């Protein structure tokens, strides 16, 4: 069984290694948590590249084909699914307290609650699982990485949680670049298939 998967990353920048130090320089949003965003859909990566280019005043769009670790039951948190018991156990062991049951029902609640807990927030559970600021998102990503979580994951379409997925990779060293392609999109941000051109960058 393969130990890796192929995913895609859309950007307006050229580089030969991923780095967490550049977080927020793409489209500037981290709605699903902090990490390096990748997707199982090439066309979605092209869309993200276009959005990043517009946000940064750039003309060029690039899609990186990357190799990443295989998604397993206990190495990720999925936004709209219950959190794996092994992940919960590792987290509770490290923080020394029990996570409330209502927080375990969905990865997005778990992530936000834990982030707020790590930054010392002392408010109602409902508030802690509802919103998390940038500091909380940063702390929770670092913490989850330390207990063996590789990904924050969410569905490409909220109506189809078992279809294409997007992920935030928590450790830059888990991403291997296989190739870089320059792409163009039309006025509706749809990939122009004939525009795809592999480029060499060192």
Question: For each of these PLM feature ranges, what is it?
Answer:
Residues 2-31, 39, 52-202:
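Active-site and NAD+-binding cores of ADP-ribose-processing enzymes
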């Amino acid at each position: 069984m393969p130990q890796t998967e192929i995913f895609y990353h859309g950007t307006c920048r050229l580089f030969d290694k991923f780095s967490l130090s550049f977080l927020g320089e793409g489209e500037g949003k981290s709605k699903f948590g902090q990490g390096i965003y990748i997707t199982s859909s090439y066309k979605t990566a092209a869309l993200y590249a276009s959005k990043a280019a517009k946000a940064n005043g750039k003309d060029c769009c690039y899609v990186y084909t990357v190799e990443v670790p295989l998604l397993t039951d206990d190495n990720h948190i999925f936004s709209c699914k219950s959190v794996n018991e092994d992940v919960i156990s590792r987290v509770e062991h490290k923080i020394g307290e029990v996570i409330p049951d209502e927080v375990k029902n969905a990865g997005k609640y778990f992530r936000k609650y834990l982030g707020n807990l790590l930054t010392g927030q002392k408010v109602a559970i409902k508030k802690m699982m509802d919103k998390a600021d940038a500091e909380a998102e940063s702390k929770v990503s670092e913490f989850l990485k330390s207990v063996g979580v590789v990904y924050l994951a969410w569905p490409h379409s909220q109506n189809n949680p078992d279809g294409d997925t997007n992920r935030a990779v928590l450790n830059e060293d888990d991403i291997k670049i296989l190739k870089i392609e320059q792409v163009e999109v039309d006025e509706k941000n749809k990939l122009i298939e004939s525009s795809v051109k592999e480029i060499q960058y060192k």
